[in-house]
């Protein structure tokens, strides 16, 4: 699947019961029902390790698992996917599947997601001299983030998160400014919008 090496294929079911046991506190009340409403079943499809693909491990990363999650609905709750991503204590690339569409998701300081695509449109490349760099490349492939010179991957992810936050604040303020009838308040909002835009340029 997605051009990953055949030698990495394992296809091992991951039962929801394991998640219910590990996250009993987090899935209390109706949260378990919400999880069940999102997730149909899960299968570990690939294990990318030194043994399976002949790319050396690092101290931090001994393997990267690919987990296919069959969804019951397309508009799932991110919190459920974040819980799944932390289950192993290992690096996990998640393939979300709904009807004929796939979405890649990966957790690196926060949940990062690609656009929904058809299977034939997705190609995962094992780029890197070790599993650490393969993981970093998976993160950039999924998120579309370009790491700027002088930044680490994590630093760039934080920069992108700050940019997204500023862009949302700008959009919210622009909407309020359009509705505002008092000229003084409208002017103050326009000034704040300009400040946010200048800040967003600093982060580019």
Task: Report the location of each language-model feature.
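Short, charge/polar-rich alpha-helical segments
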Residues: 147-161
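N-terminal, leucine/charged-rich tether regions that mediate assembly and partner docking
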Residues: 1-88
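Non-transmembrane amphipathic alpha-helical segments
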Residues: 159, 163-180, 196
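Conserved small/polar residues in nucleotide/adenosyl-binding loops
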Residues: 202-204
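Extended assembly-interface/linker segments at domain junctions
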Residues: 72-151
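Short, charged, amphipathic alpha-helical segments
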Residues: 183-194
């Amino acid at each position: 699947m997605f051009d990953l090496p055949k030698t990495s294929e394992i296809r091992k079911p991951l039962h929801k019961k394991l998640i219910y046991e590990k996250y009993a506190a987090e899935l209390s009340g109706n949260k378990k029902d919400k999880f069940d409403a999102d997730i149909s079943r899960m299968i570990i499809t690939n294990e990318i390790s030194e043994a399976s693909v002949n790319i050396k491990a690092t101290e931090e990363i001994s393997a990267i698992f690919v987990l296919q999650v069959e969804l019951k609905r397309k508009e799932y709750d991110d919190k459920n996917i974040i819980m799944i991503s932390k289950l192993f204590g290992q690096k996990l690339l998640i393939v979300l599947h709904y009807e004929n569409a796939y979405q890649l998701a990966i957790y690196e300081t926060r949940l990062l997601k690609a656009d929904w695509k058809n299977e034939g449109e997705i190609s995962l490349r094992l780029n890197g001299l070790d599993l650490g760099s393969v993981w970093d490349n998976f993160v950039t492939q999924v998120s579309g983030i370009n790491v700027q010179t002088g930044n680490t991957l994590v630093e760039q992810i934080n920069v992108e998160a700050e940019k997204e936050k500023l862009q949302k604040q700008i959009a919210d303020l622009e909407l309020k400014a359009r509705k505002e009838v008092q000229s003084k308040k409208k002017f103050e909002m326009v000034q704040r919008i300009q400040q946010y835009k200048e800040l967003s340029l600093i982060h580019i």
